[in-house]
Amino acid sequence: MYKGFDRSVSLYRQACKVIPGGVNSPVRAFKAVGLNPVFVKKGEGARIYDFDDNEYIDYVCSWGPLILGHRHPRVVGALERCLNEVGTSFGAPTELENILAEMIVEAVPSIEMVRLVNSGTEAAMSALRLARGYTGRNKIVKFEGCYHGHADFLLIKAGSGALTFGVPTSPGIPAAAAAGTIVARYNDLAGLEEIFKLEGEDIAAVIVEPVAGNMGVVPPAPGFLEGLRNLTARYGSLLIFDEVITGFRLAYGGAQELYGVAPDLTCLGKVIGGGLPVGAYGGRREIMEQVAPSGPVYQAGTLSGNPLAVSAGIATLEVLKQPGVYGRLEQTAAALEDALKQAARQTGAEVCFNRAGSMLCAFFTGEEVKDYASACTSDTARYAAFFRSMLEQGVYLAPSQFEAAFVSLAHGKEEIERTAEAARHAFKAAVEQK
């Protein structure tokens, strides 16, 4: 039974005195849904609990990393062993780093060598520096609505016209940082071909989320990823898949296994740390050997490959490698999608559902969502009403229309049934939202 948010409100006020906006990442503030943030006390399996003793079925899963659920015994055991027998950090190589790197190389055919870092932002930033160093070119292409971390030259929105050189999206980003970034429309291969006709000889790389997961969930159109592969190869540019979200989530080999397209470089994060801070970038040996100390492209990190994150990552991948795991995730996610669709139909809610494997999104729009522009037709006020109703009924979703919901191995029939029942009331609340 819903018990209110008094303790969370008190903690938020306390946080606002010492933390900008009261949170350490903006979306956590719940501004888009008109609430104060829920302060989480603990997690277990598919559930989280707040400081007012409310219980929630969790579909945020720490924004994707917790594919096994909260406090999975294998991960907890690995962390305990690491703390008791190894340590937290050395700033020196460990055998654990070798093990995780070998597991990644074995899992992802396009990766022959991999470098561990501390976050998805570091992975994308480093991969793009490497692409520029390897090709000797300066410009990059990203896609509208795709997020690759908060490095200056990646926090860019589209300009106007066919060739859309970027415009900074945040104060503090110099115009010069955006000058080398070209923004294209996701799923628009013809538009990208026009960009390459004009600038192709200067483009070092195209970076893309193979399934966009930061404007909701937007899968690639048939032939889009294949077209990117062919176009970049034709012009001698590198293709970079940002699989920070999709890596080891959509398949053991990531989105590139699912869609059968091999990039030159891949960015990883989230799942490979089992809930601890981590990132990685990897690719063909001839490219990766340009990274220092093997080559001249510099990248470093004090806590890169730290034993705790690596131990949690190894334990997570060991579970994911077991037979039938991704079939179970697919079955659960499909059941959730079907249940939500049925609830929406019963209430007359106008919703577009997109799903790729165990990540999905309910867009409050009557349009097919295939890119950033169509995602932006969503009625965010209706989503906020839906979110608030679900939260009060014990279902924790992303506090933004433009984020994914994630299914973990801890979710099962009971969670789906409870979510479906809550959704029937929540979609009704959304329909009644003025």
UniProtKB/Swiss-Prot annotation:
Pathway: Porphyrin-containing compound metabolism; protoporphyrin-IX biosynthesis; 5-aminolevulinate from L-glutamyl-tRNA(Glu): step 2/2
Database matches in InterPro entries: 4pyrrol_synth_GluAld_NH2Trfase, Aminotrans_3, Aminotrans_3_PPA_site, PyrdxlP-dep_Trfase, PyrdxlP-dep_Trfase_major, PyrdxlP-dep_Trfase_small
Keywords, alphabetical: Cytoplasm, Isomerase, Porphyrin biosynthesis, Pyridoxal phosphate
Catalytic activity reported: (S)-4-amino-5-oxopentanoate = 5-aminolevulinate
Subcellular location: Cytoplasm
Superkingdom assignment: Bacteria
Gene Ontology biological-process annotations: protoporphyrinogen IX biosynthetic process
Enzyme class: isomerase
Major localization class: cytoplasm
Assigned protein family: Belongs to the class-III pyridoxal-phosphate-dependent aminotransferase family. HemL subfamily.
Assembly notes: Homodimer.
Name of the protein: Glutamate-1-semialdehyde 2,1-aminomutase
Species of provenance: Pelotomaculum thermopropionicum (strain DSM 13744 / JCM 10971 / SI)
Name of encoding gene: hemL
